[in-house]
Regions:
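N-terminal "domain-start" segment
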Residues: 1-91
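Functional cores of ribonucleases/endoribonucleases
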Residues: 57-141
């Protein structure tokens, strides 16, 4: 029985010209690592949010300062993600889930808010070492 040698990726496509790792994205602030809180919410995979999700939904708007905090807003997001995973709305490598966030009224007035139902996307892909990890992003992000 003859074994054929498998062609490597470098042989097929040439050497990697540039790679931007998840670790670098977290260090640069492009991704926000929320793994510890995600584990508390029942999510087993390392988890990160895109900077856009963090700024748009986790960071507390100025008019809601003192009424909400980032930890509570993050918990709401991760709890709803965990519920979507348990309900099998996140299947395969991606899916969407909904979270309600208190957002400033228009025009902004201190302490006055309206609830906004937001649809976010969760993608499961490889971490730098090839193990699975989760990234939460806005639906328009990739």
């Amino acid at each position: 029985m003859k074994h054929e040698r498998q062609t490597t990726m470098d042989e097929l496509f040439g050497p990697v010209i540039f790679a931007y790792t998840r670790k670098e994205a977290i260090a640069d602030g492009v991704l926000v690592d929320v793994t510890e809180t995600a584990r508390e919410a029942g999510i087993k995979l390392p988890t990160a949010l895109t900077r856009a999700v963090f700024e748009d939904y986790i960071r507390v708007p100025e008019s809601l300062q003192g009424f909400q905090d980032e930890a509570g807003r993050l918990w709401d997001l991760l709890w709803m993600l965990a519920a979507a995973i348990r309900a099998k709305r996140i299947t395969g490598d991606r899916g969407t889930f909904k979270v309600s966030f208190a957002m400033p009224a228009s025009p902004p007035r201190m302490g006055v808010h309206k609830n906004r139902l937001v649809t976010l996307k969760a993608v499961c892909g490889p971490a730098d070492d090839g193990s699975p990890c989760m990234t939460v992003m806005e639906r328009t992000e990739d």
